[in-house]
């Protein structure tokens, strides 16, 4: 391996991510770049090439980061090796963005020419600045009738503080501005540094399980080189393996003879034990290990917890294996076993938000052919007990008795909402209604305002974003980050069906709203739970006190239909017999609870009035 020659090649590598607010056109821009650099033939071209999950295509969003290598012949006559990493734009997947940026020297920031800078644009820029990346601004969708590139340039300079004088004006759909962007990537984004003669040091930024090759690690090399036959060590677990293949994705995997410092590619080493690998780990040489590991990533704490249960308990092990494989590919997913009296055995899973939860459930059902029931999502509460201890409560059913609790604290998020000036009142009303505490408000220009609130996470996770969009005709955008815990007057509400507590339907609410929420949920369950052959009382209770009750009426079979004329006592006897049978059935009858019932706990009365 001629290190001097390879060192020269290193000058022509460019590593960059594409970041943007959701729906600003990242994936379409990536498509055009792949097309213009002839990475993909016209025949194989399709929309959202890098979104290789069916789910991503159907929803029109990027869920997973995706790395691809392409070759660009620049105006200076040299061939450059680009490593492009496409990233998600939704707040739930910001962890994927931070992982992508750690593998790059630069970021292409895409801003919609009509929408301008939005909350998630800002959040992603701050992530890129934290990593000290060179940012290339692109104003996309300039072909839209509502496009105003000059106004957006001004916003980029005023709100973000970036020089936008030579921002690329582009339309990814029409292919306008892409050649200019590729030239700016060459001139503005620095080549990777890294000593090829130093011990191997590579960051694992993603991994996926392959049934034939074992775990495939996506890596960015910072120092040294790696080739098949090399012995490697994973610094976190200490496990050692022999490399069987190295290569790059273009976008299909292409095996290479070696990878050098600055490259973004993959390695396989017949790793069959999933627990050995962790995203953020450092790969080094087993014979000549590096002194210390790369910084890796800050651990992401789940925001939302929910129970996942197989409808068939025999599939519990299949669910465990599926979750382990998904965790490889999605480092922010957490899970641990739990059991419920109503649903049997399953797992308590931690997610970054509702979309993340939705995507995981759908991937489990599609990719692993599982049939699941998901309980209503909840957040982590801190219950301070009278004996001086503190208990973290992820499942409402595990909240201790009220008599044992001194106080309860709930997680608070700092919510940043960008909205047009005309909708300030609507945004503030919604935040106040969801127990928000106003922090500050800043007018960004003549049209838009940035409003910051402290809000309980439990009030945001389910439908706050949808409400915000409908109250502002789709113009507002939201970003939030954890901001500690705060005491609140919270109570646990139990739901009883036919006199039995259904632990999976328990939820936690603010005492002020508890009676109304109890009545609301009891009446909603009455509509959702199918009628049985016996009457079912539906009750909501705080401790031993029933705060709401309604009844699901029984089916009534006409047991006297075959009678005609004759003695009335015969009719009465049959009706009494039916009554006794129903009483017996009610004592032993099991109520079938459909999936919608678990989600009904989360809906608010506003949803009912739509």
Curated annotation (Swiss-Prot):
Known EC number: 3.6.5.n1
Per the record, the GO terms for biological process are: positive regulation of translation
Its GO CC terms are: plasma membrane
Q: Name one GO molecular function term.
A: GTP binding
Which residue ranges does the record assign to the tr-type G domain? 11-193
Q: Does the keyword Ion transport apply?
A: no
Top EC class, one word: hydrolase
- Membrane topology category: Peripheral membrane protein
Cited function = Required for accurate and efficient protein synthesis under certain stress conditions. May act as a fidelity factor of the translation reaction, by catalyzing a one-codon backward translocation of tRNAs on improperly translocated ribosomes. Back-translocation proceeds from a post-translocation (POST) complex to a pre-translocation (PRE) complex, thus giving elongation factor G a second chance to translocate the tRNAs correctly. Binds to ribosomes in a GTP-dependent manner.
Q: Which NCBIfam families match?
A: lepA, small_GTP
Protein known as = Elongation factor 4
């Amino acid at each position: 391996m001629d290190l001097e020659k390879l060192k020269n090649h290193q000058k022509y590598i460019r590593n960059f991510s594409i970041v943007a607010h959701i729906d600003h056109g990242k994936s379409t821009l990536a498509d055009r770049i792949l097309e213009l650099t002839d990475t993909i033939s016209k025949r194989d071209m399709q929309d959202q090439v890098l979104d290789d999950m069916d789910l991503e295509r159907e929803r029109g969003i990027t869920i997973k980061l995706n790395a691809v290598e392409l070759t660009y012949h620049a105006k200076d006559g040299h061939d450059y090796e680009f490593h492009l990493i496409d990233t998600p734009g939704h707040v739930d997947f910001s962890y994927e963005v931070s992982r992508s940026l750690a593998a790059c020297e630069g970021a292409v920031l895409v801003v919609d020419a009509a929408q301008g800078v939005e909350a998630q644009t800002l959040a992603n820029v701050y992530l890129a600045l934290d990593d000290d990346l060179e940012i290339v601004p692109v104003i996309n969708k300039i072909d839209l009738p509502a496009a105003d590139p000059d106004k957006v340039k001004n916003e980029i300079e005023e709100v973000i503080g970036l020089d936008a004088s030579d921002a690329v004006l582009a339309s990814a759909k029409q292919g306008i501005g892409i050649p200019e962007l590729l030239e700016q990537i060459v001139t503005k984004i620095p080549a990777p540094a890294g000593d090829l003669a130093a011990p191997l040091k590579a960051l694992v930024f993603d991994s996926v399980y392959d049934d034939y090759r074992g775990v495939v690690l996506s890596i960015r090399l910072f120092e040294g080189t790696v080739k098949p036959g090399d012995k490697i060590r994973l610094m976190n677990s200490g496990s050692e393996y022999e490399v069987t293949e190295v290569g790059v994705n273009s976008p299909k995997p292409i095996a290479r003879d070696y990878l050098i410092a600055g490259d973004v590619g993959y390695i396989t080493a017949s790793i069959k034990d999933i627990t050995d690998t962790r995203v953020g780990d450092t790969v080094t040489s087993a014979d000549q290990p590096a002194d210390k590991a790369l910084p890796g990533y800050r651990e992401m704490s789940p925001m939302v917890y929910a129970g996942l249960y197989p409808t068939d308990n025999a599939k519990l092990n299949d669910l465990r294996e599926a979750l382990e494989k998904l965790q490889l590919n999605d480092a922010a997913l957490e899970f641990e076993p739990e059991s419920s009296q109503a649903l049997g055995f399953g797992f308590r899973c931690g997610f970054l938000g509702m979309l993340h939860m939705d995507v995981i459930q759908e991937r489990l059902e599609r990719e692993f052919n599982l049939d699941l029931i998901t309980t209503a999502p909840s957040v982590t509460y801190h219950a301070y007990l009278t004996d001086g201890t503190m208990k973290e409560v992820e499942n409402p059913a595990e909240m201790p008795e009220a008599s044992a609790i001194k106080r309860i604290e709930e997680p608070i998020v700092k919510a940043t909402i960008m909205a047009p000036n005309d909708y300030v009142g609507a945004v503030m009303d919604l935040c106040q209604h969801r127990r928000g505490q106003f922090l500050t408000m800043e007018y960004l220009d003549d049209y838009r305002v940035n409003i910051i609130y402290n809000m309980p996470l439990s009030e945001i996770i389910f439908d706050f974003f949808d409400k915000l969009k409908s109250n502002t005709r789709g113009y507002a955008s939201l970003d939030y980050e954890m901001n500690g815990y705060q005491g609140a007057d919270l109570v646990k509400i139990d739901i009883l069906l036919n006199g039995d507590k259904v632990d999976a339907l328990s939820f936690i609410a603010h005492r002020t709203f508890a009676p109304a929420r109890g009545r609301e949920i009891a009446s909603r369950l009455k509509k959702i739970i199918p009628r049985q052959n016996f009457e079912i009382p539906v009750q909501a209770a705080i401790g031993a006190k029933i705060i709401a009750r309604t009844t699901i009426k029984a089916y009534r079979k006409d047991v006297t239909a075959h009678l005609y004329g004759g003695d009335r006592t015969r009719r009465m006897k049959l009706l009494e017999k039916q009554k006794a049978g129903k009483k017996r059935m009610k004592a032993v009858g099991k109520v079938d609870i459909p999936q919608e019932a678990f989600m009904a706990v989360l809906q608010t009365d506003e949803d009912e009035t739509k």
